[in-house]
Amino acid sequence: MRQRKLDLPARVNGDLALTFGDVALTSYAGLELFGRYLRRTRFNAMVRDVFRGTPLGGDYGVAAMVRLLVALVVVGGRRLRHVAYLADDPLVRRFAGLRRLPMARTVSRWLKAFTMTTVGRLQDLNAGIVGRVLPALGLRTVTIDVDGVVVSTGLQVERAFRGFNPHHRKVPSYYPILAHVAETTHILRVKNRSGNVHDGKASLPFLRELWEQLVATVTRLRGVRFRMDAAFFREDVLRWLGGRGVGYAIKVPFYFWLDLQAHIRTQRTWAPVAPDVSGFALCEALTP
């Protein structure tokens, strides 16, 4: 409804009182809930056990450095220099268990101390975390998506190459292979690779390592199924999957010797697969 003109103005007779005090404000209150979850799951103890005996100590401790990097990623940081923007946030310091955050150079030197051995320990830490969570979810089937991902890098990074990033052709990048649970998005395993590698290269050793991890994590291996793109349509991968007795779905490339176009043109009956998606099944023995 229309307001009276006399009801719109407000009288201001003096200055607003301002009081300055030492008040600890934060922009990342959600870290407290995350921190409680980590304490309940004894995350710090897991980190110390995994990295025991490695040269990753330092003044801050390995658990504090790991939690600081986790906090940096959670709040949206993408570069080590972004740690400086979090130095005065009390909840970030509380989450990391530190009274004072390290400088970006200190974090960089700590990361440079990583070797292939300590990277393997990091894989063990991730496997241990997922191994605790996944059985408790009671999933009847576990769908594992295996695919290559693009990680952009700086200009002076070893084994990073230009031209292989489909969205940023001029940006150097890595091309790691990653496996995650489709139902929950938990990352099971990741392995870094050069930026110019084919997606299916070295996929079989990665799948073997992933399977060893699943044997120790999943109670019903018959309920495991894999999903992969066309780069994994290889004889060695298909034989390996068939030998494990698991379900799988792999995109089939349009190789000329498959002559899939002819089957598509002549197929009369298509069955619905998903909303706005239909298909048909084809069983045929082929030799390339």
Where are these regions (language model features)?
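Active-site-proximal flexible loops/turns
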Residues: S152-G154, F232-D236, L258
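Acidic/histidine-rich, metal-coordinating catalytic segments
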Residues: D147, L221-F233
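Hydrophobic "anchor" residues on beta-strands that sit immediately upstream
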Residues: T143, R225, G247
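Dynamic "connector" segments at or just before major functional cores
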Residues: M1-H198, S203-T219, R244
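An anionic, glycine-rich sequence signature occurring as long contiguous blocks
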Residues: R2-L16, F20, G247-P288
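A short alpha/beta connector and helix-capping loop motif
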Residues: V157-F164, E235-P253
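Alpha-helical scaffold elements adjacent to nucleotide-binding pockets in ATP/GTP-utilizing enzyme cores
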Residues: F206, D236-W240, H263
